[in-house]
């Protein structure tokens, strides 16, 4: 089964995935219409800064077993047997945050949601864009990612590709393959900026 796979070494922190995610979860599924919606749609993928300010797109891994599901006291969090996606029923969520405390990745957020009763704050996380994939589209975050940091693929195929990259790297005794030149240059500049900042502070 396909899923969104994260390649953090390719992330440039542009946050287009966050914008696309919010728009995809708007009632009208349109960025421009989303601005006028109440409650305003929020992204379910979040880009944070890692080492050397490297971007990291953090999203739900739909763990199996899922710690959030096991911690949910009301049974609001469940796994869809057809898609293997961990979902949240907003009608049953009581905003207790037990799921957030159990999640090892910190991906749950709490805010008003279009699918929830008006004015109710509920737990929200990635739903693998199930509505989009049911129509034959790929998840919004992977669709807009131009660097390959987020790809929609079979896990086995993605792992085989990683193995090939490692094998090529070892056999050629060079740096990792598959990072676009512009991304590699961007990462080099980020590292130089961090080093320069440290030198100035001394």
What residues fall within each predicted segment?
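Non-ligating segments of multi-cofactor redox enzymes
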Residues: 1-202
